[in-house]
Amino acid sequence: MSLYKPVKIGNLELPGNLFLAPVAGYSDKAFRSVCVENGACFTYTEMVSAEALIRDNWKTEGLMARAYNEKAYSVQIFGGTEDVMQQAAKIVLEKTHCECIDINCGCPVPKVTKTGAGSALTRDPERLYKIAKAVIDVCQDVPVSVKIRSGWDKNTMTWKEAAQAALDAGVKAITIHPRTKAQAYE
């Protein structure tokens, strides 16, 4: 019995369920290409700063480049406000023609969370909803997903509320990193 099964994310139909997760510093174009060669049917870029995108940072744009053998991939963006995330989503769609946009709600790094982005969004479901809705509003037929953590710390396990906010906004898939922000990369 094969564990490899087709998956549907919104209107995106994928031939299999072997995905490469978005990991900052690791899921660059070259690594994604190697993973596709070894069976991954869907990949995510490492997280891309929405602020850097709207400021036209060429290095940031390079993070979004599709590998030659990627048939389907998602660009993951992070930011703390609806306006910036919506503008960034427009740029991603114009420059990449990716099959999905993923909202990072999992990064535990203080320079990200202090701006209200990354795992700070898991702690604030209302803001997560607003950001997801703003991104979805510009994506039209391109599905939007989110990656969340289980919570802020062991006393603030907010994954259910965050997931529900994302679903209420209309996201088509949710990835859960089963550690809290406080656990970081333990």
Spans of features found by a protein language model:
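Flavin-dependent oxidoreductase catalytic cores
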Residues: 1-186
